[in-house]
């Protein structure tokens, strides 16, 4: 009498690695979507300088320097 033993490999370790890689790539992609800080400056009539820093595309912070 002959026996045939079929051993099926568990695909979970390889599937787990792919899921972790996809999650890491997605998180890096989300972090790269925010725009960088963009400083720009203007000069008033009395030669005092006002510097604006745009953070995240919509928030503007005013920094006055004399």
Swiss-Prot record:
Entry keyword set: Membrane, Transmembrane, Transmembrane helix
Transmembrane segments in this chain: where? 11-31
Q: Which GO terms describe its cellular component?
A: membrane
Membrane-topology annotation of the record: Single-pass membrane protein
The compartments listed are: Membrane
Q: What is this protein called?
A: Uncharacterized protein p6
Q: Which organism is it from?
A: Tobacco necrosis virus (strain D) (TNV-D)
């Amino acid at each position: 009498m002959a026996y045939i033993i079929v051993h099926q490999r568990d695909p979970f370790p390889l599937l787990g690695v792919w899921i972790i890689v996809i999650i890491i790539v997605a998180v890096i992609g989300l972090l790269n979507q925010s725009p960088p800080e963009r400083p720009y400056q203007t000069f008033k009539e009395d030669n005092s300088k006002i510097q604006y820093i745009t953070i995240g595309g919509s928030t503007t912070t005013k920094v006055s320097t004399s």
